[in-house]
Each structure stands twice: as C-alpha cells, then as structure tokens.
Amino acid sequence: MNYLFKNGRYMNEEGKIVATDLLVQDGKIAKVAENITADNAEVIDVNGKLIAPGLVDVHVHLREPGGEHKETIETGTLAAAKGGFTTICAMPNTRPVPDCREHMEDLQNRIKEKAHVNVLPYGAITVRQVGSEMTDFETLKELGAFAFTDDGVGVQDASMMLAAMKRAAKLNMAVVAHCEENTLINKGCVHEGKFSEKHGLNGIPSVCESVHIARDILLAEAADCHYHVCHVSTKGSVRVIRDAKRAGIKVTAEVTPHHLVLCEDDIPSADPNFKMNPPLRGKEDHAALIEGLLDGTIDMIATDHAPHTAEEKAQGIERAPFGITGFETAFPLLYTNLVKKGIITLEQLIQFLTEKPADTFGLEAGRLKEGRTADITIIDLEQEEEIDPTTFLSKGKNTPFAGWKCQGWPVMTIVGGKIAWQKESALV
C-alpha cells in the first residue's frame, strides 16, 4: 500500500517545523514537499499534526526469551509502536543470554517472527553476563548484534572491560554500560538521600555510578573505543562525561524520561512503581541532567523500558524489582513537561529521540529523507489524555505516572511503509 499524508508539519533539514505533505511508495519515503499529488496512494489527511521520523530507543527490555510473564517481543514491540518508536535496541538480560551463536540466532528468529517494529539486539560482553569470560564478539556482530553490553550487571573487572573495549574497537562497535560499582551499592533500593533517610531504607549513593563511569572513560580512552553510558542520573556523572568529551574521548550518553521529569522529592511514599535503577536522585542531580542535555554532554533520550508484573511490584519497595515501563508514555511526558514548559524546544525533543541516537550508532533512521525506509510517526500535539496503565499494550503496567495529564500523543506509527499501529478514529 502507498500512502499520501496531506496537510502535516515536519522538522526540515534546517531544524524548523514547516508545513508538508509526505508520500510513501513501496515502503520508502518517495517525496517530502507541499502540495503533493499522487495516483495509486491512499490519502490520509493528518490535519496539521506532526509528521515525525519514527522514534529510536537504544535501551529497552523485551524480556523474551525467559521472562515472557513480564513482556514478550510481540507485546513489547506493539507497545513501542503505540509510543511512536519504530527502531528499538533490546538489552541482553534474557534467559538464555544472547552470548553465543545458538542464542543469538534463536533471538533473531523470534524477532523476525514476532516484532511489530525494527528490533536490534545487543550482544552480551561476557558469557551469561557474569563477568568472567568474554563472548565471541565477531560471531555476535556477524549475527546482527547492535553493540555490546552486560546491561544491568556492570562489568566489575577492569581488565575484562579493557579487553572488551579493545575487541569492540577493532570491530568498530560500541561498548554500552550500566554503571555501578558493586562495592558501593549498599543493598540499596532508592537513592541515598532525603527519601532513604526519612523511610529508613538503604540508599545507593551517587558516587556508585560516577566512579564507575570515570573508570570506564579512562579505559575507553586507552582502547580508543566508542563508550556509551546508559541512563545517566547524577551531577557527578554529567561532570565526568563533560570533561571526557572536552578531552576528545569517544564517549556518548543517554538519559531517561523519568530522570528528566522526576527527582526523589517527587516520590510520594514507599511506592515500588517509583523504584528504578539508577534511582531517582536529588534536585541538583535533576538540574544537572537538564543542563547536560542542553549543552550536549548527554546525547539522547532512551526509555529503559522495563516491564514487571503487578505481583512482582507488589512485594514492597525493598523486595520489588527495579524498573518502570516507558514506551507508551515517553513522548507525551517529555513534550508536556519539557517542551510545554519551555525547557527544551520541540525541535530539540525530536532530535533527542530520533536523529541523535541514530547518528550516534550509525543507524539509517531518525530522519524523513527521500529514498529512506518509511519509518514514520504521526503525533497529535494538541491531544490531551490522562495516563492510564490499564490501556497499555505492554504487559507491564508499572508506571509512576498514572493519572498524569499529558499532551502530544502518537496517533499512527508506520514501519517499513506499513501501518504498525494507529489510534482508532484519530485520522479520518
């Protein structure tokens, strides 16, 4: 099916929002201009809505194989499509871990069979993510590994991390890290700060993250490797990354929507839906994340979509697993709480969710350019809705944002020229 989207707006190559039509033919973007006419195309009047590149998320958890009670490739990618994401990068904390040919081939077959959006899997740095034996990077790259990470289990051994970075550099691949110094975690379930003190909970100190980033940055410099920092959360981490960039070290970083919108002061009670890793930090950390995003220290926004069951989250804040679901709330949360409040512009938000992650990792995504694959999201910037977890397509309903009123909701997502998801009656 060919589609002609009429009367939309998009961000042009100069970074300005302008009026446009957009023609999709044979799965590709055929033309982006005003007043397009075309035969043999279904005309869809978007009536002034935003025509955006499909959103790109480099940090997601799909849980399959091994955790299908939390999420599946089918449910997770359908939730991603509903959130406007057309390309997502799946972390390797599955069971089994994609750490060898057999496991990666199985994962890729599952993706091919079930995914509603483009899914790029990470390969594990170490076998079973336990940090003792490096995986075969060459084989994992051959089978389509997006980059290498041990995800939520930071590589604690410096010699192992250096060896991994050297091997990745030879393959022109990135090493991606969840940064925690295990000896400083302190069995914490929240940030070490006012909230932990008030509720008598063990806290995770900010330095637990920043000291690990500092170590890895120096290792990356020694290996001449692209090193990407997951979900930055502290003022100290922002400072370390900023200094490294100024020194010319190949480091990039991401921040989550929840760390941009919330801090520990916003946690109403010992609610496990506010438990994520890294935890919500203090006000100064929150301000530093915004500053880092605006000055280029932090390159992109990624959801860290981490679904869990209601039963798991009901165990209480100390025993419940870390993580919140993120696909279906990311854009409206960021648009409402950052763009509408004048903290960043709409153009910047689009870049942080599209071209910046795509460019950082060399993906042919993130831009509406003629000849490229038609991965597109239509967003109604005027639509206001209340976040209702019962309507999520993800199996995970674990969100701290239930009841929040937000503007800027995706209404249609196109992947490879085909409609992957659309809101009923939104485009008539």
Swiss-Prot record:
Instruction: Provide the protein name.
Output: Dihydroorotase
Q: Can you tell me which residues bind Zn(2+) 2?
A: D151, H178, H231
**What family, per the record?**
Belongs to the metallo-dependent hydrolases superfamily. DHOase family. Class I DHOase subfamily.
Give the highest taxon in the source lineage.
Bacteria
The pathway to which it is assigned is: Pyrimidine metabolism; UMP biosynthesis via de novo pathway; (S)-dihydroorotate from bicarbonate: step 3/3
Name the needed cofactors. Zn(2+)
Instruction: Identify the EC number(s).
Output: 3.5.2.3
Q: Which residues form the active site?
A: D304
**Positions that bind Zn(2+) 1:** H59, H61, D151, D304
The source organism is Bacillus cereus (strain 03BB102)
Record: residues binding substrate: H61, L62, R63, N93, N277, H308, F322, G323
Could you name the Gene Ontology cellular component terms for this entry?
cytoplasm
Query: Can you supply a Gene Ontology BP term from the record?
Result: purine nucleobase catabolic process
For this chain's record, the cofactor binding note is: Binds 2 Zn(2+) ions per subunit.
Q: Does the keyword tRNA processing apply?
A: no
Name the CDD domains for this protein: DHOase_IIa
Q: Which NCBIfam families match?
A: PRK09357.1-2 (NF006837), pyrC_multi (TIGR00857)
Which Gene3D superfamilies does the record match to this protein?
A: Metal-dependent hydrolases, Urease, subunit C, domain 1
A single Pfam family it belongs to is: Amidohydro_1
